[in-house]
Amino acid sequence: MPLNNRLKEYRAKINVNQTEMGNLVGVSRQTISQIERGDYSPSVTLALKIAKVLNVSVEDIFSYEEEK
């Protein structure tokens, strides 16, 4: 299930690195990196935490694209 995300883009807008983002939402830098690369899909709870820190909606960051 491909989950597209704009986490890196939004994170850069608030000038926060992966380590800082991880600390803000309670995960490791590696988890943030995996999410940005598309190697890991966050839980609903984590997606909501990320959206809250970035002050955007979950839909602004993450989008689902059906495989054709």
How would you name each of these model-derived features?
Residues 27-40:
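Recognition helix of helix-turn-helix/homeodomain-like DNA-binding domains
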Residues 60-68:
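Short, charged recognition helix plus adjacent turn
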Residues 37, 56, 66:
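Short, conserved catalytic or interaction motifs in soluble domains
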Residues 19, 30, 59:
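Residues within helix-turn-helix
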Residues 5-23:
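Short basic helix-loop element that most often maps to the first helix and adjoining turn
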Residues 45-60:
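DNA major-groove recognition helix of helix-turn-helix/homeodomain DNA-binding modules
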